Every structure is written in structure tokens, then in C-alpha cells.
Amino acid sequence: NLLANHDSRNARIDHPGIYGSYLSTHRGNVDYRNNVIYNWGSNTTYGGEDGSFNIVNNYYKPGPASKEKKYFVDAYWYNSSSNVGSAYPRLYMSGNYHAGSYASSINGDQWSGVYYHPQGNDPSTTDGRLSAPLSIKAGDATVCHTTTHTAAGAFDAVLSYAGASLCRDAVD
């Protein structure tokens, strides 16, 4: 996937409020993998309140409108009064790459690429750091499998194959 030229929501990961009374039955683990995020404006990937996410091998390439953010994820937290959770997201971080020279330090330390958005009386930021990827299951509870590229491989694949039509044209 190519997420390009947005001011924000690159992606806005899984806000628990969208589930209403179905939160316990419809919310599951989310796998955000092999995306190219370009020219993000004011924010890159953010949100995730009290959810569970694999953030793997995504390529963050700043463009002319990109703010100099030194992170992959801006993690949000909800308090218990919101009735939708009371924690930052649980994250498995691996292989993400930030092409901005101002942010090269986060490529070697994925956790330094997570910004825990300050929202008052926050819980510990280390509780949600997962050391192994989350299992992703289909509706029938079978485990899903996917091809995983390196972040650089994903960047090359997206530039080579993503576009508006099957046949490459001037727009692609």
C-alpha cells in the first residue's frame, strides 16, 4: 500500500470507539505491514488506544509537506472513564525504516520510534512492548499468512506494482 500526501491518518490505527457495543467481539489484532508512507504532513501512523498491533517493515519517506517527526507511531492512550480501555496500544515493532536523515537513529532502535502521546495521568509506556508478533486469524479462527518484505523491498515493490490500473500509464 502507498499512503501519500495526507496531512494525517497515515494510518489512524483502530480507534476503539468505532465498535460501539461490539468492542469485545469485533476487535482483534491488527497487522500493519509493508506499507510506504510518503509526505505525511502533520502526522504519520497514530492512535491505537488499548489495541494490539504488529507494525512491521513499513517505509516512512518524508516529502515536502512532512513535519520532522522522529517516530513511526504516535501512540495514544485512553483512560478508564472513556469506557474503551485504559492503556496505550500493545505493539510489536520490527524492521520499520525512516528515510529522513533527522530520524536515522530510530531505524536501529524501533522502540525509540514510538512516541507515547502525553494525555494526562498515563500508565507505564513499557507494558505494551511486545517481543513477538501477534497472531493474525481469519474469521474462522485459522491463522493467516502473508508475504513479508523488508521495508526497502516493500518500497521497491510498491513503486513497481502499485497504481491506479493493471497496465502502467503516465498517472501510475
Specify the residue positions occupied by each region the protein language model found:
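Extracellular low-complexity, Gly/Ser/Thr-rich intrinsically disordered linkers
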Residues: 125-172
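Glycine- and acidic/polar-rich repeat regions and solenoidal domains
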Residues: 1-145
